[in-house]
């Protein structure tokens, strides 16, 4: 294994990287990486530095050859003709198709606008099969709900968008209706099967200015299913709840580390009132919290999940704002369709699929995890 000359970041060996082209445009190099056998979640590009990959066990440099400003400018021109105006204001996101792959690129300046940079995340061109994600049957059943609110939560970059796309496509294959997604940006493209698919993009050049306005519009567009790509503020949380109360199924993503933290965040965004807690309790159908962990061999990711399917007993606890009581019931395994993150981590540890250190970092209950190990 080689080490990058100017840092302690490892450089891929020739055997690991035999398919990577020595010459070619930056777009061609990125395409080769996207179609290679290498396992990674992101490509990180800094002007005057080598291409970097985020692999399950950390960062690696693809080669020792630095990427020039001219190469980055050429790539930016491909994904956004007005990139120089956009980047002068702030970083910008673009999702595009590159032949066999679909990517989201976040482009930015740094070091006082002296250098250019870009982080690329790849997505499947079509949704992955829901049954192939590693979700439990109880979690897959969320796609069968006809109404109410389902929250998909977790830290950033934990596969929430992939899960939602797979749930939407599962609905798309099994029943007829109108599915509206509000995304920033549109990531995986959903093909039309039994449903009409309306994928709306948030942003300056998009279809709508904000998640809130997209959700507000959706109510008048006769949806059967609505996806809110991220609940970021109180207005969007309130509109998501109002939509769920009005009849459609609402799938929404929320940044939170555990089920109880996600519920607490929703209650806070809704105004911390008893009336809103009661409304949330009656509209909520389930919560899926997920984390991606590197395998012990470092050659893939494993999905660990925490699942809450709302029962009458759990609804009563949520109405009362008793989040600690919800955690206690989940820990006790007293409700069908519920399991803790620790239960999922325990199965992965028993199969020697992940390390104890990575499991400890992913747990939503450190005290309970200590009893496992």
Tell me the role of every PLM-derived stretch.
Residues 2-373:
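Short, flexible helix-loop junctions that flank or precede catalytic/ligand sites
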């Amino acid at each position: 294994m080689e080490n990058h000359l100017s840092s302690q970041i490892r450089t891929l060996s020739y055997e690991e990287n035999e398919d990577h082209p020595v010459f070619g445009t930056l777009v061609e190099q990125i395409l080769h990486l996207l179609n290679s056998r290498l396992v990674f979640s992101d490509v990180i590009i800094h002007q005057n530095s080598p291409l970097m990959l985020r692999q399950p066990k950390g960062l690696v440099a693809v080669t020792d050859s630095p990427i020039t400003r001219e190469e980055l400018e050429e790539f930016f021109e491909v994904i956004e003709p007005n990139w120089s105006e956009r980047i002068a204001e702030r970083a910008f996101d673009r999702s595009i198709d590159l032949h066999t792959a679909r990517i989201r690129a976040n482009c930015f300046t740094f070091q006082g606008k002296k250098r250019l940079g870009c982080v690329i995340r790849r997505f499947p061109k079509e949704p992955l099969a829901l049954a192939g994600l590693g979700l439990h049957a109880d979690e897959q059943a969320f796609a069968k709900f006809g109404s109410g609110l389902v929250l998909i939560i977790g830290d950033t970059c934990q596969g929430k968008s992939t899960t939602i796309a797979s749930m939407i496509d599962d609905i798309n294959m099994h029943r007829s209706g109108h599915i509206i997604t509000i995304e920033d940006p549109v990531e995986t493209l959903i093909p039309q099967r039994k449903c009409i698919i309306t994928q709306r993009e948030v942003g300056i050049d998009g279809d709508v200015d904000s998640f809130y306005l997209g959700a507000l519009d959706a109510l008048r567009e006769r949806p059967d299913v609505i996806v809110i790509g991220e609940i970021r503020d109180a207005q969007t949380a309130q509109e998501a709840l109002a939509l769920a109360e009005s009849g459609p199924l609402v799938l929404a993503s929320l940044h939170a580390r555990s089920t109880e933290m996600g519920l607490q965040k929703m209650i806070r965004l809704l105004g911390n009132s008893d009336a809103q807690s009661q409304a949330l309790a009656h509209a909520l159908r389930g919560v899926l919290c997920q984390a991606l962990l590197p395998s012990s061999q470092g050659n893939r990711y494993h999905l660990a999940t925490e699942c809450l399917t709302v029962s009458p007993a759990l609804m009563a606890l949520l109405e009362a704002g008793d989040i600690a009581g919800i955690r206690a019931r989940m820990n006790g395994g007293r409700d069908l369709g519920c399991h803790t993150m620790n239960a999922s981590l325990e199965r992965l540890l028993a199969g020697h699929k992940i390390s104890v250190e990575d499991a400890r970092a992913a747990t939503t209950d450190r005290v309970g995890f200590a009893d496992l190990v």
